[in-house]
Design a protein with these regions (language model features):
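N-terminal beta1-alpha1 ligand-phosphate binding loop
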Residues: 2-22
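Anionic-ligand binding patches
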Residues: 2-4, 26, 40-193
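Cofactor-binding loop segments of dinucleotide-utilizing enzymes, especially the Rossmann-like FAD-
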Residues: 9, 29, 110
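A short beta-strand-loop structural module common to alpha/beta enzyme folds
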Residues: 25-33
Length: 193
């Protein structure tokens, strides 16, 4: 049996791995998340690489899985909203438009000395939102921990009529692609303890 280390403390990422039956050990990297990359794909890959490599330095063996996600909209990377005002501005900006959830993933296999890095993109289509709807959402949701101030798995779901791409990517872990990459390395879900 092999060990899989999740370089994240994200409840959502843990839930996704739990849902598919993937056994893992939580080992968050605790790095300061700084990237100088402007392109959202490069930005997410850079941060997922930093996290995975920080964990790899502390281990002799294992498979490390790391991810980083952002919302990309009209040439800007939108980070987690820190205030109600920031969440309001983000949701107002996204209203009636399409934004892109980008997740960079790094898998470092210390057993085979291999590394895989990829990104996934999903288009998220928002309904037109009234000020009343935005204010209701902000008062009734834990927006402060969410990229661009929203979570498709929460109350925002009522404002998102469709997506193009992987739903789980929006949540921060494109699990189908992760599984395909683990298979390329020769692993099955049941290989991890």
């Amino acid at each position: 049996m092999k060990k899989l280390y999740l370089a994240s403390n994200s409840k959502t990422r843990k839930q996704i791995l739990d849902n598919v039956g993937l056994k893992y050990i939580v080992n968050p990297s605790n790095i300061e998340e700084i990237s100088l990359k402007d392109d959202p794909r490069e930005y997410c890959i850079d941060l997922s690489n930093q996290k995975a490599k920080a964990i790899a330095k502390t281990l002799k063996e294992g498979v490390i899985l790391s991810a980083d996600s952002v919302i990309y909209f009209e040439g800007k990377i939108l980070e987690k909203s820190k205030t109600k005002e920031e969440a309001y501005e983000n949701l107002k900006m996204l209203s009636g438009k399409v934004n892109i959830a980008v997740t960079g993933v790094t898998i470092i296999d210390l057993y085979q000395n291999k590394e895989i890095t990829f990104y996934e993109e999903t288009e998220v289509i928002f309904d037109d939102l009234t000020d009343e709807e935005i204010n209701w959402y902000i008062e009734n949701e834990m927006f402060i921990f969410e990229r661009a101030g929203y979570s498709i798995a929460g109350k925002t779901a009522i404002y998102i009529p469709s997506i193009k791409g992987d739903y789980y990517n929006i949540l921060g872990m494109p699990i189908s692609k992760v599984y395909k990459e683990l298979k390329k390395l020769g692993y099955q879900i049941s290989d991890f303890e």
